[in-house]
Amino acid sequence: MPKEEVLEFPGVVTELLPNAMFRVKLENDHEIIAHTAGRMRKNRIRVLTGDKVLVEMTPYDLTKGRITYRFK
């Protein structure tokens, strides 16, 4: 089965929410709610307010996403 199309956008974490969720402001001024990807949790990569991140989203729900990378 082919992997479904995902959209990737850079953004900035604006708020930490409960249950390892984050409010992220994308470069196109949209605000979404995102959680960290499994590999980031496994490697214990911390995400804090103000961090620049790469968010992966599905075209079906543009209000939720997955943080896949934290820029240095």
UniProtKB/Swiss-Prot annotation:
Top-level taxon of the source organism: Bacteria
Alphabetical UniProt keywords: Cytoplasm, Initiation factor, Protein biosynthesis, RNA-binding, rRNA-binding
Pfam families hit by this protein: eIF-1a
Residues covered by the S1-like domain: 1-72
SMART domains registered for this protein in UniProt: S1
Subcellular compartments: Cytoplasm
InterPro entries on file: NA-bd_OB-fold, RNA-binding_domain_S1_IF1, S1_domain, TIF_IF1
Alphabetized GO MF terms: ribosome binding; rRNA binding; translation initiation factor activity
GO CC, any one term: cytosol
Entry function: One of the essential components for the initiation of protein synthesis. Stabilizes the binding of IF-2 and IF-3 on the 30S subunit to which N-formylmethionyl-tRNA(fMet) subsequently binds. Helps modulate mRNA selection, yielding the 30S pre-initiation complex (PIC). Upon addition of the 50S ribosomal subunit IF-1, IF-2 and IF-3 are released leaving the mature 70S translation initiation complex.
NCBIfam families assigned: infA (TIGR00008)
Family named by the database record: Belongs to the IF-1 family.
Quaternary structure and partners: Component of the 30S ribosomal translation pre-initiation complex which assembles on the 30S ribosome in the order IF-2 and IF-3, IF-1 and N-formylmethionyl-tRNA(fMet); mRNA recruitment can occur at any time during PIC assembly.
Cited PANTHER family: TRANSLATION INITIATION FACTOR IF-1, CHLOROPLASTIC (PTHR33370:SF1)
Name of the protein: Translation initiation factor IF-1
Species for this entry: Chelativorans sp. (strain BNC1)
The encoding gene: infA
